[in-house]
């Protein structure tokens, strides 16, 4: 039982050392991630359309 208590005390200690982002930082990072995902979604969709068009042009 002492091992469990020691473990959870260690977890609590480490969680207190963790630096969490502010609301502004969290919002900024969320916008960056969502923007990047949308960019790559559009990029790969356009790439897929281009490859499909090229395939249809070459092979009918």
Curated annotation (Swiss-Prot):
The record ties this protein, via PROSITE patterns, to: SECE_SEC61G (PS01067)
For membrane topology, the record states: Single-pass membrane protein
Where is the protein found, in the record's own terms?
Cell membrane
Parts of the chain that traverse the membrane: 31-51
Tell me a Gene Ontology molecular-function term this record carries: protein transmembrane transporter activity
Q: Which UniProt keywords apply?
A: Cell membrane, Membrane, Protein transport, Translocation, Transmembrane, Transmembrane helix, Transport
Query: Gene3D superfamilies recorded for this chain?
Result: Preprotein translocase secy subunit
Q: Which family does it belong to?
A: Belongs to the SecE/SEC61-gamma family.
Biological process terms from the Gene Ontology for this record are:
intracellular protein transmembrane transport; protein secretion; protein targeting; protein transport by the Sec complex
Report one GO cellular component. Answer: plasma membrane
Q: How does it assemble?
A: Component of the Sec protein translocase complex. Heterotrimer consisting of SecY, SecE and SecG subunits. The heterotrimers can form oligomers, although 1 heterotrimer is thought to be able to translocate proteins. Interacts with the ribosome. Interacts with SecDF, and other proteins may be involved. Interacts with SecA.
Question: Taxonomic lineage per UniProt?
Answer: Bacteria, Bacillati, Bacillota, Bacilli, Bacillales
Q: Which domain of life is it from?
A: Bacteria
Function noted in UniProt: Essential subunit of the Sec protein translocation channel SecYEG. Clamps together the 2 halves of SecY. May contact the channel plug during translocation.
Q: Write the protein's name.
A: Protein translocase subunit SecE
Q: Where is the signal peptide?
A: none
């Amino acid at each position: 039982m002492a091992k469990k208590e020691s473990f959870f005390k260690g977890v609590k200690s480490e969680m207190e050392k963790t630096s969490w982002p502010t609301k502004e930082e969290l919002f900024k990072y969320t916008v960056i991630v969502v923007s990047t995902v949308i960019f790559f979604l559009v990029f790969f969709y356009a790439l897929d359309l281009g490859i499909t068009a090229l395939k249809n042009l070459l092979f009918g």
